[in-house]
Structures are given as structure tokens and as C-alpha cells.
Amino acid sequence: MKKTVKNLTALLTLALAAPWALADAASELQTRLRKVSVFSADFTQNVSSANGKQVQQGSGKIQIKRPNLFRMDNKKPQESQIIADGKTLWFYDPFVEQVTANWVSDAVNNTPFVLLTSNEQSHWNQYNVQQNADTFVLKPKAKNSNIKQFDIRIDGNGVLKGFSTIEKDGQSNLYMLRNINNNDIADNLFRFSVPKGAEFDDQRKKKK
């Protein structure tokens, strides 16, 4: 009987502690991210299938300016741009000449990259966060998210080392960073204008 009571007490303690642990991890991650206000780096991307087989390699450049400004230029194997200007998340595919625009608040569920620059608690509230040393594991609360998991590797000084995603179908994307610097970045690099002749899918009008 005493053993049963002890087991129940231990389980209750873990149950009560879990929410606090998640909250502490989210707070620690946000604290680390806030330590660096400007960041840019080249990246290499490895895409693997659910069974671990590498299916594609890519490269590009990522630029961050806090708060809320984000830009990712994919250069290989195919050019594309993801730009967050603080309100709108733009995705541009020059190969098919198509632009998609979403409100950041609507897109963060499927595009967790914007959390790297976001101070908006409503964005962070969409994810559960766990910490394992310098790796933070983010899992979306919404069941309809296309993302299963987003990992951020960042040290105690706020230096972003890399990140990765696991999609709902099991495909993983690993981003490794190099040529990291903290030189100032002009705000106009985070502005986007729809190129002439491009097809424009404005999801903002459909959701607001």
C-alpha cells in the first residue's frame, strides 16, 4: 500500500511539474534568442525521407533582425524566398512566378521559422517547448499543422547553431549554418513587392 501511495505521489509530482518545465523551456529559449538582435548566415540544407534516406541537398542564406523580421533565400536546388516583414509572411517561387501572402499570426503554425525573431506571445503559445541542453524541441499544439517538430540549436550566448524540421509525413529538413555574422542589416531587405507578372495568392483576404 505504501509503495502504491509513493508511486501515485511521484506521478502527481511529475504531472504538476511538467507544465512548469515546458514554460521554463519556452522562457529560456526566448531569453537566448533575444540576446542577438541581428544575425545572418549561409546555410546548407539536407532533406531526408521518413526512413532516413537523403533525398535532396540545398543551400541559401538566412537573415534575422529582431523583432519580427526574417528572410530566407533558398538558392539551390531551386530559388525561392520566405520573407516576414512583421505582419505578412511572403513566399515567392520565381520558377513558377508565384507569390503567396499570409498573416504571420496565421502562418506561424506551419512556418515556425518566424519564431526565431518573434516576441509575440500569441505566436509562442501555439507551441510546446522542451529543452535538452542547447537543443530546444518545439511541437505545435494544433493537430492540423504540417509540422510535427521544430528543433532549434542555440547556445547560452544566443548564438544560433542550426535548426531542423520534421514534417507530418516524416520528412526532415536539417539546416546547418556557417559564415555567421552580426553586422547590421537594412530594413528594406525585409520588404517585399510582388514582381510584375507573378501570380499573387493573397491568403490574408481569405482569412480576415
Swiss-Prot record:
Predominant localisation class: periplasm
Alphabetical list of InterPro entries matching this protein: LolA/LolB/LppX (IPR029046), OM_lipoprot_carrier_LolA-like (IPR004564), OM_lipoprot_carrier_LolA_Pbac (IPR018323)
GO CC terms, sorted: outer membrane-bounded periplasmic space
Keywords: Chaperone, Periplasm, Protein transport, Signal, Transport
Leader peptide range in chain numbering: 1-23
Cell compartment(s), UniProt: Periplasm
SUPFAM superfamilies: Prokaryotic lipoproteins and lipoprotein localization factors
Origin superkingdom: Bacteria
Function comment: Participates in the translocation of lipoproteins from the inner membrane to the outer membrane. Only forms a complex with a lipoprotein if the residue after the N-terminal Cys is not an aspartate (The Asp acts as a targeting signal to indicate that the lipoprotein should stay in the inner membrane).
Protein name per its UniProtKB record: Outer-membrane lipoprotein carrier protein
